[in-house]
From Swiss-Prot:
This is Cyclotide mela-6. Probably participates in a plant defense mechanism (Potential). Binds to and induces leakage in phospholipd membranes, particularly ones containing 1-palmitoyl-2-oleophosphatidylethanolamine (POPE). In vitro, displays cytotoxicity against cultured cells but no hemolytic activity towards fresh erythrocytes. Not active against Gram-negative bacterium E.coli ATCC 25922 or Gram-positive bacterium S.aureus ATCC 25923 up to a concentration of 64 uM. Coiled coil: none annotated. The keyword Endoplasmic reticulum does not apply. It comes from Melicytus latifolius (Norfolk Island mahoe). Disulfide bonds join C5-C19, C9-C21, C14-C26. This is a cyclic peptide. The presence of a 'disulfide through disulfide knot' structurally defines this protein as a knottin. Belongs to the cyclotide family. Moebuis subfamily. It comes from the Eukaryota. Pfam families: Cyclotide. Keywords: Cytolysis, Disulfide bond, Knottin, Plant defense. GO terms for biological process: defense response; killing of cells of another organism.
Amino acid sequence: GLPTCGETCFKGKCYTPGCSCSYPICKKD
């Protein structure tokens, strides 16, 4: 399936494809 967002942003970046930083958690783009 698709990767799940939800990791903590690191310096404003998310490493899961298709996710963006909604500080402090990554959200689906």
